[in-house]
Amino acid sequence: MELKNSISDYTETEFKKIIEDIINCEGDEKKQDDNLEHFISVTEHPSGSDLIYYPEGNNDGSPEAVIKEIKEWRAANGKSGFKQG
């Protein structure tokens, strides 16, 4: 999948695929690094990759829980959400 410029360029389904690829270590080492750096960059969440690797609270580390936490944090901080569709 081509990486996009902003989280608002992704549907939740598209972004879930990136999270799944990170969790499942899909691709070679460069692709894994690119996906993780992209995740950190576009989510802008202060916990960064810890959302996936060291989840806290109600986040069980599943792609759905990670997306839920990202959405809640972005909304609470006045940031754009995922593309509808």
UniProtKB/Swiss-Prot annotation:
Recorded coiled-coil stretches: none
SUPFAM superfamilies noted in UniProt: Colicin E immunity proteins
InterPro entries: Colicin_E_sf, Colicin_pyocin
GO biological process: bacteriocin immunity
The keyword Transferase is annotated on this UniProt entry: no
Keyword Lyase among record annotations: no
Entry GO MF terms: toxic substance binding
Keywords linked to the UniProt accession: Bacteriocin immunity, Plasmid
Protein family according to the UniProt entry: Belongs to the colicins ColE2/ColE8/ColE9 and pyocins S1/S2 family.
Role this protein plays: This protein is able to protect a cell, which harbors the plasmid ColE8 encoding colicin E8, against colicin E8, it binds specifically to the DNase-type colicin and inhibits its bactericidal activity.
Stated name of the protein: Colicin-E8 immunity protein
Organism: Escherichia coli
